[in-house]
Amino acid sequence: MNETNEWSRLSRRRQQKKKRKGRITFILIFLFAIIAIVGTYYASKINHTINLITQGVGNRTEQEANEIIKNAKPINVLLLGIDNGAYGRTEEDGRSDTMLLLTINPTQKKSQLLSIPRDTYTEIVGAKIYDKLNHAYAYGKATMVINSVEKLFDTAIDFYVQINMEGLIEFVDAVGGIEVTSPLTFNYENRTFIEGKTELIDGESALRFARMRYDDPDGDYGRQKRQRIVIEKLVEKLMSFSSITNFEQLMNAVSKNVKTDVPIGQVMALKNTYSPALTSENLSQAFMDERQLLLKNNEGQEVYYSYATDEVLLKTSNSIRKLLEKSAVKTYPLLQQREDLYYLTIP
């Protein structure tokens, strides 16, 4: 890809970001919906599934986490969409291709969803290197992503929720398929989608719809947009109990493809206390104003990264701190000393 085409694509992405409206965040609501749709009738099966998906990964003890939720404190939740399997990668070299930081203040009934560019050039905490942020998962799974995001924004992550994209097939089939309207015409792996055409698709087609990247003029942003469409349609189906055609299949898909460190006994309390702040009226979208950075990697290849100045990081950190009811900081504590590493920037 030449520099002109890359710059044109990046410009389109910036313009489209400004047009996006606030929505109910999809990954956390997806987890909540799975639990809420079935009520107490399937309580034992749900509890078994929750036991399978909850894992102690973050930097909070279970007692601390319980107190946070019990006292309705403002929280940060890191939402990760992992590409294990779905894009030809293994568990060892997977990437967190979708990273969202959700800050929720249940008392104010306000929340902010920060989209973190996957190519953000930053320190990978624990690996002693600088790289794209989405590579942190390959180096040290969710723990390293959490630690790297905490340092990048100078804020604590209270909980995380992770969904593997390879589970899309099972999720979609379990609800009897979903209706999607393609934003563009394309063919991927012998499956054709027509711009503006609404159709009912199964799990295999949903995965093809969500994973195509290189034929989209908007590149990775276009792929993320289609992933949002699929997940939002899944949520719509999950909110209607009658839409679930195979409950056992759904629970199996959840246990294999969803992970979180929310304490088992607090999942429903988290939903009941914090979800009112997640409506479209109460949720604001936030984006980082980043420059593009061209570096040579360890193999001497030229690679594009997203680069946030300390001023941008300060502004972003303070927007998070405000919702957490913490004092703003005037100078950013993170000195990354990256300026001597690059030889070309696109302002």
Task: Annotate each language-model stretch with its function.
Residues 2-8, 16-109, 290, 304:
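Entry/capping segment at the start of metal-dependent catalytic domains
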Residues 55, 64-65, 129, 262-347:
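C-terminal solvent-exposed extensions
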Residues 72, 173-250:
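Flexible, polar/acidic helix-loop-strand segments at domain edges
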Residues 72-75, 94-99, 108-116, 128, ...:
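Extracytoplasmic
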Residues 86-90, 130-139, 154-159, 214-221, ...:
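Second-shell loop/turn segments in exported
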Residues 96-98, 130, 142-150, 165-169, ...:
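Extracytoplasmic/secreted envelope proteins and their assembly/folding machinery
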Residues 112-140, 184, 191-198:
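Flexible, solvent-exposed short loops/turns enriched in glycine
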Residues 134-193, 241, 261-263:
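Amphipathic, coiled-coil-like alpha-helical scaffolding segments used for oligomerization/assembly
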